[in-house]
């Protein structure tokens, strides 16, 4: 019985990453790539697409 090894590309640097429980940062190849990705989300360089163009001020207006 042969076990096939699954690999994916790191979303940050595109290096091959083995997809199993020994790859603690999967889908990233390293903690560095994981933190780079987190920083991109925090800086809003990455976002989930949406059809609604609602500003934050409309959703969170103060009421008294």
UniProtKB/Swiss-Prot annotation:
Keywords: Metal-binding, Zinc
GO biological process: regulation of DNA-templated transcription
Domain of life: Bacteria
Subunit structure: Interacts with GyrB.
Cofactor: Zn(2+)
Family: Belongs to the DNA gyrase inhibitor YacG family.
Keyword Metal-binding found: yes
Name this polypeptide is given: DNA gyrase inhibitor YacG
Residues at which Zn(2+) binds: 10, 13, 29, 33
Role according to the record: Inhibits all the catalytic activities of DNA gyrase by preventing its interaction with DNA. Acts by binding directly to the C-terminal domain of GyrB, which probably disrupts DNA binding by the gyrase.
Molecular function in Gene Ontology: DNA topoisomerase type II (double strand cut, ATP-hydrolyzing) inhibitor activity; zinc ion binding
Entry note: cofactor: Binds 1 zinc ion.
